[in-house]
Amino acid sequence: MITTSLRRRTAAAVLSLSAVLATTAATAPGAAPAPSAAPAKAAPACPQFDDRTKAAADRGVDVDRITPEPVWRTTCGTLYRSDSRGPQVVFEEGFHAKDVQNGQYDVEKYVLVNQPSPYVSTSYDHDLYKTWYKSGYNYYVDAPGGIDVNKTIGDTHKWADQVEVAFPGGIQRKYIIGVCPVDRQTKTEIMSDCESNPHYQPWH
């Protein structure tokens, strides 16, 4: 558990390096912090958007067709996706759903049977890549919204332990933080080869 947590923190540090440098560069050197008479305010809650497809790579997706009534994710934590495509493709194209027109819009049917759908799957679980290690890459995603699958259809289905967040219409490239390749022999991320996405745009 300690090793897993350490690797997760290391990957996050690698992928966040550019953001840290940008923040440092924006701070005037030698500037003293202004005194504050009032206590510091708490950090703002995760931004919420009326547009349920704000993250979508394909805006043609029709959320009104989604059944059952979806429970939308309202948190801002990092999500993860195992994928066989390398960053040279994903960083340029983002993640596109297989079929936003005629695919399976019913969330439960989509989850239980692998079939063309308007969704792109991600997970709350960083370590899920160890199950799908043959895919080769573990992508880090920072996108608004998405459907919390277990809260939508319950957590007793056979794939509940994947703690999935499904994105209707996929995920635009600007919401992908970066990627770590996976060693298929050891089922671990190759930390020295993690890459940050140059198109990533922090939004909160």
From Swiss-Prot:
Entry annotated with the keyword Ribosomal protein: no
Motif PN (phosphate-nicotinamide) loop per record, residues: 132-136
Enzyme class, UniProt record, top EC level: transferase
UniProt GO molecular function: glycosyltransferase activity; nucleotidyltransferase activity
First and last residue of the signal peptide: 1-42
Domain notes: The PN loop (phosphate-nicotinamide, residues 132-136) moves dramatically upon GDP-binding.
Oligomer status and interactors: Monomer.
Protein name: Guanine-specific ADP-ribosyl transferase
Activity regulation description: Inhibited by NADH.
Known role: ADP-ribosylates the N2 amino group of guanosine, deoxyguanosine, GMP, dGMP, cGMP, GTP and dGTP; oligo-guanosine, oligo-deoxyguanosine and tRNA are ADP-ribosylated less efficiently, while dsDNA is a very poor substrate. Also acts on GDP.
Result of changing Q162 to E/N/S: No ADP-ribosylation of GDP
Activity's dependence on pH: Optimum pH is 6-7.
Family label: Belongs to the pierisin ADP-ribosyltransferase family.
Coiled coil: none
Disulfide-linked positions: C46-C76, C180-C194
UniProt cross-references to InterPro entries, sorted A to Z: Pierisin-like_dom, ScARP-like
Compartment(s): Secreted
GO cellular component terms, semicolon-separated: extracellular region
Binding site for NADH: R81, S82, D83, S84, R85, K98
Domain of life: Bacteria
Source organism (scientific name): Streptomyces coelicolor (strain ATCC BAA-471 / A3(2) / M145)
